[in-house]
């Protein structure tokens, strides 16, 4: 009902802006001492892992020298070992965001250092 002069009797509510809730996904920044690495999932096939190696090693700024013959991470000379190095290098260089370890569902985050022998993985 309107009062005199066409003014509403009750105040008109104003819309409030939508505010993201705490359930919105927000990547957590890496913290000192909280080291993580990206490695292949156990069920990833050699073909999928070779595709990951090919992709990472074709990108500008990525150094795949360590997984080439005579490189510090060439041995063990397996697709899985080479993919571990390449996938982790990508993950670390892109800021350690979990989504940078997806690799079409073939990557997994671990807190166990995959380095071995003379091969040191970035962390």
Curated annotation (Swiss-Prot):
Subcellular location(s) of the protein: Cytoplasmic vesicle
Question: Region (Disordered) spans which residues?
Answer: 1-37
Q: State which tissues express it.
A: Expressed in mature and germinating pollen.
Q: Could you list the residue ranges forming a coiled coil in this record? A: none
User: Where is the secretion signal located?
Assistant: 1-21
Q: Name a single GO cellular component.
A: cytoplasmic vesicle
Keywords, comma-separated and alphabetical: Allergen, Cytoplasmic vesicle, Disulfide bond, Phosphoprotein, Signal
> Which residues are connected by disulfide bridges in this protein?
38-101
Metal-binding found in the keyword field? no
**Metal-binding found in the keyword field:** no
Q: What does the entry report about post-translational modification of this chain?
A: The N-terminus is blocked.
Which Pfam family, any one of them, does this sequence belong to?
X8
| Highest taxon in the source lineage | Eukaryota
The protein's job, in short, is: Carbohydrate-binding protein binding preferentially 1,3-beta-glucans. May be involved in pollen tube wall re-formation during germination.
- Protein name as catalogued: Major pollen allergen Ole e 10
Q: Which organism is it from?
A: Olea europaea
What does UniProt list as this organism's lineage? Answer: Eukaryota, Viridiplantae, Streptophyta, Embryophyta, Tracheophyta
């Amino acid at each position: 009902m309107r009062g005199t002069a066409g003014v509403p009797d009750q105040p008109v509510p104003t819309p409030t802006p939508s505010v993201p809730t705490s359930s919105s996904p927000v990547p957590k920044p890496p913290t000192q001492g909280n080291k993580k690495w990206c490695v292949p999932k156990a069920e990833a096939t050699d073909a999928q892992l070779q595709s990951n190696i090919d992709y990472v090693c074709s990108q500008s700024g990525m150094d795949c020298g360590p997984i080439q013959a005579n490189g510090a991470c060439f041995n063990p000379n397996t697709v899985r070992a080479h993919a571990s190095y390449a996938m982790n290098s990508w993950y670390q260089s892109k800021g350690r965001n979990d989504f940078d370890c997806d690799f079409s569902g073939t990557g997994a985050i671990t807190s166990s250092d995959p380095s071995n022998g003379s091969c040191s993985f970035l962390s």
